[in-house]
Amino acid sequence: TSKRLNNGFIRLGHNVLSISDRDITNNNKSINDFKGIKSLQNTVINNFKNFKPDLVVLGHADTLSLDTIDYIKDNNSKITQWFLDPVGNKSPDYKKNKARILDKSEHIDTSFITSDPKSLDFKIKNSFFMPNPSDSSFETLSNYRNDSEKDLFFAMSHGVHRGSLKKGKFDNREIFIKRLIKKNNNINFDIYGMNNIEPIWANQFITSLAKSS
């Protein structure tokens, strides 16, 4: 997602500096900084001082501290965040995702989420709906040009980048998908992440998606 957004910013003529909190924390763990979080704060602040951005865009930056965010705000930069995980009260990990999106919302200028803010049972300050970003350099398939062997593709998982189903886990999305299948015998479905069919990722995801209309 961040690469798609960055590509868009660059195409619009903006200068973009990208920082991966995961890479920094993973590469800077030590006895004095067990999770690499201190190194992350220092890296972000030092880059902020050197780059002097007009806008700082956060994406699921859970390890960025509120002190670091307040430092950025105090130095006259705008801050926004995007959040793609579901935050509806019937969605997976509702309580966890709600806490994550609210953690920084009072300290930043705006939040962009893939759920309609009006549909939520809680309020996110200065929040706006955004669709899942797409970019022609990533979305390379043109399925509409082909006669596909499958009609409808759907894939989910029991957690971001989780490679297998959780034992005993039930996802409410299964209810809708099963109803859809039951009511549409004439549609050839290709479903992953439920009915004991494991989730798919990376090239396997693209290969399977390419077979559907």
Specify the residue positions occupied by each region the protein language model found.
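Acidic (Asp/Glu)-rich catalytic clusters
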Residues: 71-75
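Structural motif
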Residues: 55-57, 80, 112
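A short, histidine- and acid-enriched strand-loop-helix "catalytic/donor-clamping" loop
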Residues: 81-94
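Nucleotide-sugar donor-binding catalytic core of glycosyltransferases
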Residues: 1-31, 37-43, 51, 60-66, ...
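Proline-aspartate-enriched helix->loop->beta-strand connector
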Residues: 48, 52-56
